[in-house]
Amino acid sequence: MNAEDILSEIQDIMRDVFDLDDLVVTPNTSAEDVEEWDSLSHVRLIVAIERKFKFKFKNSELDSLKNVGDLANVVKSKTA
């Protein structure tokens, strides 16, 4: 899976988790950009990504995430 495919999958997951059908994400999108992105929805997002891509994040990986691009990079490294 390439970076664009991963970003597209993450966008679909985020649309579902945040209930925003028209949400468009870029690698620079962060929690500050999405009003619905609070601590509870963040947990739901992480769980949904883990289920979709069939892996578990390490706490250190989660701590280092600053935006969707960072998230996509971790997913890519875990699914390569």
Language model regions located:
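Phosphopantetheine-dependent thiolation modules in NRPS/PKS and related acyl-activating systems
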Residues: 2-37, 41-46, 51-80
